Amino acid sequence: MQDKYHLTLEQNLYLAKRNLIDSIWRSAKIEGINVTFPQTYAIIEKAAVQNVSVEDILKITNLKHAWQILIQEPEAPLTLEWLCKIHGEVAKDEALEWGKLRTGEIGVGGTDYVPPIPNADAVRVFLQQMEQIPSPTERAIETMFRLIKQQIFWDGNKRTAMLAANHIMIANGCGLILVPEKEIETSQTVLLDYYNHDTLDNAKQFIYSTCIKGIDFPERKRTQGISL
């Protein structure tokens, strides 16, 4: 799986900042939070907003704070401690515990899959294994799906996993993972199939083919295509 983009860190951070509200809005939609883009913008800008629950406002605000960490610390190593730090923002005042690994059993809606109770050492080994994947884009996508399936936290696993994936993408200049609005329903189907049948390759290909966003430089491509 080849990287689609080769941006500088500065370029990728610019991309992340430009797409901050869109990223948060799409994550909210994936989680089933019924908010519009203008409502998301208003919440992030701390403006008054109507017809949005307090719980949903909290989730969006928490996502904003988590994204701020990604932008402020783009080259921080992806460790268990970092994941807990991000989750501490994502699920603050929402999950049973935030910033700590899950210690009890949970189920996954729409599937019979029951994730095992996580072990800190096993999570660390998993993250080290992911570092061996040469392509940062593939590493980001696979890390995201495996974290989602492991459900290492009580709640907010999908949001945390997507943030972890984008952290890898940003640090390596590979663009962003953003699920287009028209593909959100398909993404849920792909994820359920992965839960039930471990169809990781299919899930990875879906994200790779439809959900990678970057900055194109047409003039650069044209120049590179000229033989001297």
Question: Model regions: which residues?
Answer:
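FIC/Doc superfamily catalytic core
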Residues: M1-L228
